Amino acid sequence: MVTHTDLMTIGEFSSLSRLSVRMLRHYDAHGVLVPEHVDAHSGYRRYAPAQLRDAADIRNLRDVGLGVSAITALLAARGTSTWTDALALQRCTLVEELHAARERLSLID
């Protein structure tokens, strides 16, 4: 069981997860990465160390171009064929975008 003393402030979690405080608030608002505890009086968010894995997955999915709704769905499907299929589809999309960009570059050269 995680105790209150084990939880990290949003700033600490931001540093460790490499997600900005602004994005952590955004992900909380969209239900993607909800803090382990929110103080009822101050509204301060606290995160559990185990949530760093979710944060890493969110960062990686965002970095490959997926949006909040896709990230939310994929986190729920982690470890399933849906996860693998979605990443394969995103890979194909990125390859197509790269091909199109190369064609546009050839018009300049």
Set out the residue ranges of the language-model regions.
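Basic helix-turn-helix/winged-helix DNA-binding cores
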Residues: 1-68
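Short, charged amphipathic alpha-helical surface segments
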Residues: 59, 71, 77-109
